[in-house]
């Protein structure tokens, strides 16, 4: 389980930081040091299970929610590295915690 979570995390860093070697290297070093720090945990211990779940959550977050951008030379625009794993949504998907739709000036996004 831990090895699979580690591999998922490394793959997610490659997807999220593919163009940025410095950040890719830093993220992988952080993942490695965290896994090495937890190496002595028993496989079925609650701490180990929580650490593996955290690694899987981080991998999922990196894969779906991190998008890097590069400034276009000679322009005030950025080119975003949106990939097939990037979570996409529209304004209709924004919900309040209690399940109500967001309304602005009495209107929803559908109005």
UniProtKB/Swiss-Prot annotation:
Gene Ontology CC annotations of this record: mitochondrial matrix
Alphabetic keyword roster: Chaperone, Mitochondrion, Transit peptide
Compartment annotation: Mitochondrion matrix
Disulfide bonds: none
One GO process term, biological-process aspect: mitochondrial respiratory chain complex III assembly
Major site of localization recorded for this protein: mitochondrion
Region (Disordered): 88-111
MF terms in GO: protein folding chaperone
Function: Assembly factor required for Rieske Fe-S protein RIP1 incorporation into the cytochrome b-c1 (CIII) complex. Functions as a chaperone, binding to this subunit within the mitochondrial matrix and stabilizing it prior to its translocation and insertion into the late CIII dimeric intermediate within the mitochondrial inner membrane. Modulates the mitochondrial matrix zinc pool.
Family: Belongs to the complex I LYR family. MZM1 subfamily.
Summary of subunit composition and partner proteins: Interacts with RIP1.
Record protein name field: Mitochondrial zinc maintenance protein 1, mitochondrial
Gene: MZM1
């Amino acid at each position: 389980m831990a090895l699979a979570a580690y591999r998922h995390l490394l793959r997610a860093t490659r997807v999220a930081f593919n163009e940025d070697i410095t950040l890719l290297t830093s993220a992988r070093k952080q993942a490695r040091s965290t896994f090495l720090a937890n190496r002595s945990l028993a496989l079925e211990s609650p701490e180990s299970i929580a650490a593996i779940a955290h690694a899987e959550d981080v991998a999922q977050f990196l894969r779906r929610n991190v998008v890097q951008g590069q400034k276009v030379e000679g322009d005030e625009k950025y080119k975003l590295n949106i990939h097939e794993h990037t979570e996409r949504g529209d304004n209709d998907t924004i919900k309040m915690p209690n399940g109500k739709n967001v309304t602005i000036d009495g209107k929803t996004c559908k109005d």
